[in-house]
Structures are given as C-alpha cells and as structure tokens.
Amino acid sequence: VLSAADKTAIKHLTGSLRTNAEAWGAESLARMFATTPSTKTYFSKFTDFSANGKRVKAHGGKVLNAVADATDHLDNVAGHLDPLAVLHGTTLCVDPHNFPLLTQCILVTLAAHLTELKPETHCALDKFLCEVATALGSHYR
C-alpha cells in the first residue's frame, strides 16, 4: 500500500513521465527485449527491437503514458488499469510474469534519467510499479 509520502513522491514525477514517455518507454522496452529475449514473441510485427525502432518508440510511449495516467489513480491503480489487464490477459494472452520484468526495466530507466531520484522516491516508484505489474497480470486466463 502506498503511503501519503509515496503518493506525493510519485505525483512529482508525473510531468517528467509524460514529457519523456516515448523515449523512456522505448528505452524500457528495449531493455526488456535485451535482457529477456523471450518477451519479443508478443511483438511479431516488430523488426527493430532497439530503443530507436519505430514500433518500439510508439509502443513505449503508450506504455509510459499508461503508467503516467495511473499516477492519477494512486488510490485505485488496479481499477484504473483493469481494461488494459483484460486486453493483455484475455485477448493478447500475455504471460503475467512479463509485467514485473517490464516494470523493473522502467524503474532502471527512470533511475538512469532522473538524477534527482532519492532513495525514498525510488522505493515509492518500486512499490507503485509492483502494483502496476500485479494489476496488469490479474486477468491472465
């Protein structure tokens, strides 16, 4: 459960997440593809899995914008992300094990770019991204 201090720390990052969604989202996806190549199987139309890949940039932007949107719903992250959880779990059949892999890559990417990231904010982000990963994996059939 996110504390009031966690929520405040996360909300302070929302603007940076939105401003850098495409670049940081693409970098996060590229990190995931590089560290866990099996995740590429869900992206059969992608030919360039680098952070510069056109489709990686587009999807990375969607991912990080969805994460930024979830920061507006910190009291109900799971409820807010439920439509995406249904899509990924029942339509796309994405293995829920992949969501923690991606959120870890997001956390690493943010830590690399946010020089002002204090340990307390890092911890708050980790807790929040764990909630995101759990929510997204909740409808796997």
UniProtKB/Swiss-Prot annotation:
One of its GO terms (molecular function) is organic acid binding. Red blood cells. GO terms for biological process: hydrogen peroxide catabolic process. The keyword Transport applies. Heme b binds at H88. Keywords: Heme, Iron, Metal-binding, Oxygen transport, Transport. Involved in oxygen transport from the lung to the various peripheral tissues. Belongs to the globin family. This is Hemoglobin subunit alpha. It comes from Squalus acanthias.
